[in-house]
Amino acid sequence: MGKKYTESVKLVDKNALYTVQEAIELVTKTSKAKFDETVELAVRLGVDPRHADQQVRGAVVLPHGTGKTVRVLVFAKGDKVNEAQEAGADFVGAEELVEKIQKENWFDFDVVVATPDMMGVVGRLGRVLGPKGLMPNPKSGTVTFDVAKAIADIKAGKVEYRVDKTAIIHVPIGKSSFGEEKLSDNFHVLMEAVVKAKPAAAKGQYIKSVAISSTMGPGIKINPGKVLE
């Protein structure tokens, strides 16, 4: 472990449960790398992801974005090609893009949007896009005829969240350079979305644990009972 990491760890009491404000203040102090570190939120939920009725998945536009340039690939035909290009899509196409991905193992994009009529074509990529979390999905607003709005939302800082096999959601909420106020705004918008997405089948405590960390910094635990304060 580097000297900077060791210094950062000293600032954090690993047994403490901090308030949101304290944690965000600490995450900016413990971000000491030479690059602008990403701040990530990890939320452990009281759900069993093996059951279809306990899946937690959705998308939300963070008020201050993530600080990351997002490359958008759109599968569309006809008029929707122009609409996607005008809205700022980085790549637009149909079968030829499917072939490019299959043959060249090409993944120079971060989000995939598709019009519903293209899902038959995109479905052929399920095995390669699925494991990377890139498969378009109506729940996250990436399967839609309104491609202009989908692209605008993504470029504005829309993030997808979904519970993994261990019932944890990992989502970036910005860069350490954002400062406390912007990180706090993004944190609250995301947590409110996750709380609203609670499945009816989930029993007991829903928000089990919450932590934030910068790319190279230690994890900072937040009191799960105070995340919406």
Curated annotation (Swiss-Prot):
User: Which GO terms of the cellular component aspect does the record hold?
Assistant: large ribosomal subunit
Q: Name one GO molecular function term.
A: rRNA binding
Q: Which domain of life is it from?
A: Bacteria
GO biological process: one example: regulation of translation
Q: Does the keyword Lyase apply?
A: no
Sorted UniProt keywords: Repressor, Ribonucleoprotein, Ribosomal protein, RNA-binding, rRNA-binding, Translation regulation, tRNA-binding
Function statement: Binds directly to 23S rRNA. The L1 stalk is quite mobile in the ribosome, and is involved in E site tRNA release.
Quaternary organization: Part of the 50S ribosomal subunit.
Family label: Belongs to the universal ribosomal protein uL1 family.
Which NCBIfam families does the entry link to?
A: rplA_bact
Q: What is this protein called?
A: Large ribosomal subunit protein uL1
Q: Give the species.
A: Clostridium botulinum (strain Loch Maree / Type A3)
The encoding gene: rplA
